Amino acid sequence: QSLKYFAALVNADKVNGFTISGKGTINGNGHRYWKSFWLRRKVIPKCTNMDELRPRLLYVSNSNDVQISGVRLMNSPFWTTHIYRCNNIKLLNLHIFAPATPVKAPSSDAIDIDVCSNVLVKNCYMSVNDDAVALKGGKGPWADKAPENGSNTNIIIEDCTYGFCHSGLTCGSESI
């Protein structure tokens, strides 16, 4: 089974040299999505992310030489930064935030590194209601069965600061 995702607010597929830089803010305005998720969870306690789909904030896939630097990424409806099947990635001086109160931002991982090589995460501030950095081995709960998925290699995370989060580094549920 392959897991389908909503398009992210910002998407880049097969864009070598993709760059976002500056002092701006990308705001996902996730409050409506979070409220909807928790309402559904209240009615159906076993509801999962697959039952209440939400968009990511930034998704980059199948790309080389990507740099995201200096921006604020906040209030993502779902994962904030999802990097999939990419090589030579720099995530520098980012401020990533999603609230834990008054409405929790469910599964608002700051950075998901997914089947990537040569990744540097440096001088980032992460405060989200889930994982700060999650290493994943492909998309979906059956990622280990899909031939297009694989491992992460040469990942460096340094000089980062963490606010509220469930973990600083997680080998995510899709890891193999």
Feature names for model-found ranges:
Residues 1-176:
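Extracellular/periplasmic carbohydrate-active domains that bind, remodel
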